[in-house]
Amino acid sequence: MKLSRRNVAVPAGVAALALAVVAIVSWLPRSDAAPVPDGSDRLPASTTTVAVAQSLTSTSSTTLAGPQTRFVLPGDDLAAMVAANPPLTTFVLAPGIHRGHSIEPRDGQVFRGEPGAVLSGAVVLSGFAERDGIWFIGGQGSDGQFHGQCDDDRPRCGYPEELFVDDAVLEHVESVSAVGPGRWHFDYDQDTVYLGNDPAGRVVELGVVPSAFHGDADNVTIEGLVIEKYAAPAQEGVIDSRRDREDRVGGSGWQIIDNVVRWNHGVGIAATTGAVVAGNQVYENGQLGLAAKGLGVTIEGNDIYGNNTAGFNSGWEAGGSKFAFTSGLVVRNNHVHDNDGPGLWTDIDNIDTRYEGNRVIDNDRMGIFHEISYDAVIADNEVRGNGFGFSAWLWGAGIAVSTSINVEIYGNVVEGNGDGIVGIEQDRSDAPASYGPLSLTGLDVHDNFVSGNEGWSGVGQDIGSNAVFTSAGNRFYDNTFDQAGTHFFWLNEEVTYKEWLEFGQS
């Protein structure tokens, strides 16, 4: 007879032992007892009781905390706990706001959030004074370090601090005279914050901590956390498996799973070799949602949207994502939408890239952009509504390949973008070109559905040579184009569909 747990009797001795454990647990310190540095007394009584009782009656998975599990309450010094515990320790963060932590993990450590656990890089500001309809508070020290290139109308994008009123980010303006509703100014010389909204009855927070997790440890796991309001500089991640932005190696094997990463200044998540970034919501960060470098990085099943809130120049580096110096990068089944910049962007020495099954919708610049890089497959993506923020020439493409070698594009739906599918040849002698000379060569575009794009599909160059059309092996074939008019580009001019076919493209 197949036995189930409900009809298995528990031996009397085991039952007695379970009762004894319950009695012992009732004596253990409560979770609000005075903390110890390593968090080792943090076993909530209810969790321990259930876990031990289950372990005595079943071999199924339980919530029993092992000797390397530490429980973290809001107010605990998490960085000190990490330093006091060995590699492979698991830290379970309790519900609530954990403020001010910047963590350098050790190898194999796990950081897991219970529902409602929030890591915040912000401090709460109170005690504002008011003068002429502007509120201000002193004593807010910061180095005021600027990094990045900004849009003309957002000249303070490069300062990492952000100000929030009831979780809404305000625009950082250049002077006190420009402060008004929805705007603020940080006078770095006087250490004073000026605010154009009455803070009475509101929660006002200033992002000041540069990162939540950083460093080059290996095999770190970060799971189930809300991570918000960190003052990460541009080109640095709030979660970052590097020591700094110049580090092109970093740690390997990070698992960044099922987190919410929002309202931070620089990059939401910056991953390196062997990382898996999956199931995260990465939204409304100041510069980029995601970045990666290294070998074998997987980006899968993330929702990436609304990034570049600080107003960085998206031609410099801003938007949904940017990947550089990768090999074997896989970007699969992500929803990438409404970013102020490109949606998915591989730029500089990427090789063996695969973009597959992504929904790339309504991004301000190109939907998918593969630039000064090498072998790639762009397959089975849905690409709609991208490129209207800058659609001059061929730059509003749903899918764009620029000065890159051996890229195959197939099975995509490319509809309603500024341009369709394009290849671009430029002089990029400034590029590292680590895998050989760069040019638009071997572009293989087939079996795509292309419809309703305002501009063109095809190939263009600005180097004064027609070789890209005649001898570089760039071709379109077996595609379905559902649009009339001169929506095709060849020999550096717009052509009709009939002329497109006569050039041997389809």
PLM features: residue spans?
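N-terminal export and membrane-targeting signals
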Residues: 1-16
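Bacterial N-terminal signal peptides
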Residues: 15-23
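C-terminal region of N-terminal signal peptides and the immediate post-cleavage residues
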Residues: 22-46
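Extracellular mucin-like PTS domains
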Residues: 46-51, 55-63
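Extracellular polysaccharide-degrading/modifying enzymes targeting complex plant/algal/animal polysaccharides
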Residues: 56, 64-252, 497, 501-506
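Glycine- and acidic/polar-rich repeat regions and solenoidal domains
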Residues: 102, 211-213, 228, 232-253, ...
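Active-site and donor-binding regions of nucleotide-sugar-utilizing enzymes
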Residues: 279
